[in-house]
A protein has these predicted regions:
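Conserved Asp/Asn-Gly motif in the active-site loop of CheY-like receiver
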Residues: 31-35, 90
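Active-site beta3 strand of CheY-like receiver
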Residues: 44-50
Length: 94
């Protein structure tokens, strides 16, 4: 079963996304902010991280930079979700 780390500071959205992903057969672990997600990524070793951008403590973009520079997490696939639509924001997530 594929493990996904779901990172979303809005508890209601985190629950909605989690229920849907569980229904699709994924193993879900979740975090409410980027700081918690970094610890969970090392501990849980997910195959994919699905993350919001705008979060307290550490943004999704900053979390992505840290994940990419950390040996244990540099190869984990990350999908960033955001309502931001500027070209700069899109490039930041690449």
């Amino acid at each position: 079963m594929t493990k996904i780390l779901l990172v979303e500071d809005d508890k209601s959205l985190r629950e909605i996304y989690g229920v849907r992903l569980l229904a699709e057969g994924y193993d879900i672990v979740s975090a409410g902010d980027g700081e918690e997600a970094l610890a969970m990524a090392i501990k849980e070793r997910p195959r994919l991280i699905l993350s919001d951008v705008m979060m307290p403590k550490i943004s999704g973009f900053d979390m992505l930079d840290i994940l990419r520079s950390t040996t244990e997490t540099k190869d984990v696939k990350v999908i960033i979700m955001t309502a931001l639509s500027s070209e700069d924001q899109r490039k930041r997530g690449e």
